[in-house]
Amino acid sequence: MPTYPETRLTRALREGEFPVIVSLARHDLDLATAAIGAGAFAIKIHLNAYHRATGTTFGSFGEERPFLERLATLGVPLLVMVGQETVPSPQELDVLADLGFEGFNIYFTDMQPHLLQSRLRPIPALGEASTDEDLQRILDIPGAMMEASVASFADYGKPLDETDLARYRTITDKAGIPVIAPSQKKFVPDDVQRLRAAGIAAPLLGVIVTGTTPESMRAAVTPIVAAARRWR
């Protein structure tokens, strides 16, 4: 099993800095630069996936590589959702690491063994139907962090509520490792302290929050980053 370096992002996650991570609605450098300009700490992209919240299909590593190479020049931590049934090959994972990607994300139920041999830190996601046994299996992966992607699709875009926060708290109490919360619910600046209080290490802001344009990205991310900095 590989060992993973401590990075700016992993330190921020472990030390309570609440770094704001942005998941791009589409592979568009203008969106990425808008997110970074608004204060995003890290950027996440998708491969081999149909993204339900946007209706966007993300291509294979080979298809998306030109964009990934441009993205890698922006100088921020990078994460990749590697796919579902189809994921990058070991050789492609090596290239992603060489480009500067430091972690990969996938639903735990879609995990493939060769992913855990790569140089990318595993960040498996719990889903709506995940169990305590699934959580424990993630904890058994050396060096893993976790994503809590546990809202139902029917609830996407609704305000964050106490039921969501209670589930996050249950997960973070059991996990003992950094847990990232994706914005399946519509996170707003006032949610920052609530998420922190539930033990969440970082928010992952996706299209439900950011919209699909550079303008909407800046408008959404800037106040959430400001709120995160106020509560450090």
Predicted segments — roles?
Residues A42-A53, L99-H114, M145-Y156, R196-A220:
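Glycine-rich phosphate-binding active-site loops on the catalytic face of alpha/beta enzymes
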Residues E6-R8, H51-L99, N105-Q117:
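N-terminal active-site wall of soluble small-molecule enzyme domains
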